[in-house]
């Protein structure tokens, strides 16, 4: 709880309770309000729809709609429950309400914030006047103005949020079970996440279908000093453009199948012809045939809104969208920037003045645009248009002034926002572009024309403060790039000083990055800027997408899920339909559409919407129920990738234990019949890397592995295999014999359980070993692990040397220490091991505790390194002070620093572990000028 210590922001001795979302925000605001204000935080949402069946109160468990948490038979009335971890917060807030005269709900001013305010109102049931306090930056003037000018709760915004919440619940809870039954457990479908996954899968399909084409070109280094000794620069490069009047083909002249789009219009050079031209032109005298000079002007970029901030932070700072929003949240709550969830590029008059003043002070009058620049955009589905994201206050603090107050990430993002805002009020960049055409003859008689293009910036204008980055996978040229050419005139002679022939391959379309995916979603009108970060995180957490560098790569599971949805629920992942649904949801918020009618049509069907809409197809419920039995799980999980050289289809099958290759081949034991041939697929193999040649290699790898010989001690065969997680060796155990009358051997396992029996020993190959060359001796060493080094005489505990997933280590009881090399596993002595244990425990790669499953970056709160460890109840993240279990959907190998720090922050916010909460009680909520909802 925070109380103000400044002069009163209100009148008289009226006591006011101000509720915000976060403790940080509460502390900051309390400092700006008077002693008559008590500021407390709700720590986010205090209630929501049930998360699972256990959350549903007993009185509703028998209801047919209970699993949804929405009474679809009673106007789609939501069932709200107070989160168990928030009950103490609610009790505390109710206690504070007893000692105040007014309640100010000061949550964020968007849909989500308005909904939090409404839920607080419904849960706390205050008996004092209630006002809505709204601000978009946490500065003293803004907070005082908001306190002095409160408004009423905006029920239209609450309705907008609640409708989306209900829609997403219906979509997810009806469609996700289809994926569980037909693809794999723990998968999920969502209104936006499924479309985002489809966009990424579609791009990978394009890459897989792509056929590369080869072409050659000729580059000349031309010397202008032969005719003008003062030419600057004297030498420049030019590309061969035409040969005997025919344009030389470039990559853009080929289609995705590697064929020319207009074969009659271009000339494709091969290595021989390009080389001959280069040789024939070396030393040739050429002349300028045309000079075209144009003025160049570039206007500044608009200030940031949520989506453009995420895109630019990804390109320039390499931040994920989740990381960007987390940092921006901290900057906002500490009063450094305005609210970071906005789709507006507008600046207030005071912000424009602040930006212009700072640009004038830092760069000079000539760098400031003559008049204030205002950036407006027509946003079809804009929500609560605030200001753009900018530095807070009427006078901006420069990054240098905040250097000591911000951590590294905060400083970098603030600097980006500050630069973009100041640059938006600066003058245009100006310069000239120059295009030259240079012609001549090759020694073999061909008439050739070279092109050269240049750009010179004569006045940088806003580029002095800020240059936007380009997407690294898409390519392109930045706005401040210059390419200078000499000032030549038509007819002027130039010599070909050097020529080179270069070969090229056309490239498949680039994979999406977080930045380009956000841009694509925005252009399609799908989702909202405030949700893009969580959507990208969700599709990675669910295993649909993984990052390879900055590229988003779909998994084979994503292919199966998208294929199922396209084939059986096509409208749900149709881009235009999803965008149109956003329009309709906004019409509800604007009062142009009745919420209950719209939800009824969507779920149960009706005449609502265009031909082919979900409503006209009978509604979501019928669509799911009617299609479920008709979905062939094997067909859905079979992705045809290509035909082999004999015309046999090759499929990737998505199995319960991962994807694998399969094709049908002749069965030598049964002439005239066929049998499946299978091959493992490695986890790190991306879909577009699977070629017919690689498939043949994988099929040729024996499933039973490469036999290394017989273990002389056991008589078991030892084989080397290549598995999903890399190469390993294992022993082949004999088939169990049938049991005797006593049933002690060969007893069949109970239904649903795997047969019991000895498991084969296995061992991963060292990094220094190769699957093709590993020997029986190597394998037996690996299978002998862990190796007993000796017994510690002080503790009487056994010390072993082992090979873990993340490297070699020693283990003594629960105390483990990393080893420097794999060879030490077999060579380290007891004395050497004891010396290692005699050293103090260290973090990181020399950690003294059990070797971590994975090492991460530093936690932004504690500043200490985070690691993933394997605990009694499963993997957890720790910074040495706070432990937080990984949750459903979190994966040790793919969890990000942002997600790990989020888990730690959530664990800190929940405080010490509490005893099990009592059973939830449900009660009807009182209407507040909107449709009623159940709550508990």
Curated annotation (Swiss-Prot):
Q: How does activity depend on temperature?
A: Optimum temperature is 30-42 degrees Celsius. Partially active up to 65 degrees Celsius.
Cofactor(s) for this UniProt protein: Mg(2+)
**This protein is called what?**
DNA topoisomerase 1
Give positions of region: Interaction with DNA: 188-193
Q: What Gene Ontology terms for biological process does this UniProt record contain?
A: DNA topological change
**InterPro entries reported in the protein's UniProt record:** Topo_IA (IPR000380), Topo_IA_2 (IPR003601), Topo_IA_AS (IPR023406), Topo_IA_cen (IPR013497), Topo_IA_cen_sub1 (IPR013824), Topo_IA_cen_sub2 (IPR013825), Topo_IA_cen_sub3 (IPR013826), Topo_IA_core_domain (IPR023405)
Key words of the record: DNA-binding, Isomerase, Magnesium, Metal-binding, Topoisomerase
What lineage is on file?
Bacteria, Bacillati, Actinomycetota, Actinomycetes, Mycobacteriales
Q: Which GO terms describe its molecular function?
A: DNA binding; DNA topoisomerase type I (single strand cut, ATP-independent) activity; metal ion binding
The family line of this record is: Belongs to the type IA topoisomerase family.
Query: Where, by residue number, is the active site?
Result: 339 (o-(5'-phospho-dna)-tyrosine intermediate)
Biased-composition ranges for Basic residues?
A: 910-936
List of residues binding Mg(2+): 21, 108
Q: What does the record give as the function of this protein?
A: Releases the supercoiling and torsional tension of DNA, which is introduced during the DNA replication and transcription, by transiently cleaving and rejoining one strand of the DNA duplex. Introduces a single-strand break via transesterification at a target site in duplex DNA. The scissile phosphodiester is attacked by the catalytic tyrosine of the enzyme, resulting in the formation of a DNA-(5'-phosphotyrosyl)-enzyme intermediate and the expulsion of a 3'-OH DNA strand. The free DNA strand then undergoes passage around the unbroken strand, thus removing DNA supercoils. Relaxes negatively (but not positively) supercoiled DNA, concatanates and knots circular ssDNA at 52 but not 37 degrees Celsius. Preferentially nicks supercoiled DNA at C(G/T)CTT, cutting between the TT residues, binds ss and dsDNA with the recognition site.
Residue ranges of the region described as Disordered: 661-688, 732-767, 841-884, 903-936
Q: Does the keyword 4Fe-4S apply?
A: no
- Tell me which positions the record assigns to the signal sequence: none
> Which reaction equation describes what this protein catalyses?
ATP-independent breakage of single-stranded DNA, followed by passage and rejoining
The cross-references to Gene3D superfamilies, in alphabetical order and at most eight, read:
3.40.50.140, Topoisomerase I, domain 2, Topoisomerase I, domain 3, Topoisomerase I, domain 4
Q: Which residues form the Topo IA-type catalytic domain?
A: 154-611
Q: Which enzyme type, at the first EC level?
A: isomerase
Task: Say yes or no: keyword Cytoplasm present.
Answer: no
Q: Where is this site: Interaction with DNA?
A: 45, 164-165, 168, 173, 180, 341, 542
Subunit structure of this entry? Monomer.
Q: Which residues form the Toprim domain?
A: 15-139
Enzyme Commission (EC) number: 5.6.2.1
